[in-house]
């Protein structure tokens, strides 16, 4: 099992994200998210990653939502939005994405995920439910409940 590290909100993390901009999927860049966090000077970073040697090979953001969407989670006061999970191509098929999902589940809170880039089946395989709804960008909305 890999060590999942919280990534600090700083320019070093921006440099680590550079490989994802060069080789990753354009829809998953997280440039605006990181820059927004740096501007807000938020103390709690929502970014997590798995390093392979000194390279960031997989990453995601876990955003806590205080205002629960009653339509999805009527029995919970809070939930996590799993945002833009991505593994660089040369590190795929090593279980890193599954480890990030398990890490998100370890918070024992409901999780809402957006199925981008044909990832719907991946989330379904990990116990998420398809609510047969789309977000404003047209991507599938999937849920996991503890």
Swiss-Prot record:
Its EC number is 2.3.1.-. Residues 7-146 form the N-acetyltransferase domain. The keyword Isomerase does not apply. Keywords: Acyltransferase, Transferase. It is an enzyme of class 2 (transferase). Coiled coil: none annotated. This is Uncharacterized N-acetyltransferase SAB1040c. It comes from Staphylococcus aureus (strain bovine RF122 / ET3-1).
